[in-house]
Amino acid sequence: MKEINPDIIFNLAAESQVLRSADNPLDTYKSNIFGSLNLFDSIRKLQINPKIIHASTDKVYGISDNLPYREDHKLYSNFTYDISKISADLIAQNYKEIYGLDITLFRSCNIYGPADFNYDRLIPHIVKSFIRKKPPIFRSNGKYLREYIYVEDLIEYIIMLTRNRGEEYIFNLGSGVITLLADLST
């Protein structure tokens, strides 16, 4: 990394599947916590100063009907995936504040778009259900509120974050449209 001396690093790597995280907590913690920690500490030791864009999730705020979330909303959850992302976020903040790394952290809502064939995720599952002319199955009663963002819109926002030079460094990225899950299937 020192030879390349990158201007920007996008830390997008993570175990992102909530169900798989629940089944494999150790692997999730290794990937999501130690993956980020290894990246940040390598940059610190190499004494390079790239802009780091660190990806997170609105799952760090837990489950709430108080949407959309604000960046100063309390971080809390009991779920493996969420805890792994909370931990990585706190480590990112630590390396920014204590070691001076140039980190901008974003927390996105649920992402949807083309080429998402993970049918454990709600939008691909609903599309597959429509194609098969079967009703979608919700893991909940469909009464949860969620915010969604189209993948290309998220990419535009992430690119804008590379130009962030202000004091604020934590951003929630979403569409601003809150949807009842059951409404997605109508």
Residue ranges of predicted features:
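Glycine/proline-rich active-site loop of Rossmann-fold NAD(P)-dependent oxidoreductases
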Residues: 86, 112-125, 134, 139, ...
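N-terminal Rossmann-like NAD(P)+-binding domain of SDR-like oxidoreductases, especially those catalyzing
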Residues: 1-111, 152
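Hydrophobic "lid"/C-terminal helical patch
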Residues: 130, 158-162, 185
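PAPS/PAP-binding and catalytic site of the sulfotransferase fold
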Residues: 180-186
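Short aromatic/basic micro-patch
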Residues: 105, 148, 178
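Aromatic/hydrophobic pocket-lining residues that form π-stacking "cages" and hydrophobic walls in ligand
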Residues: 39, 92, 125-126, 185
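Conserved catalytic core of two-component sensor histidine kinases
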Residues: 155
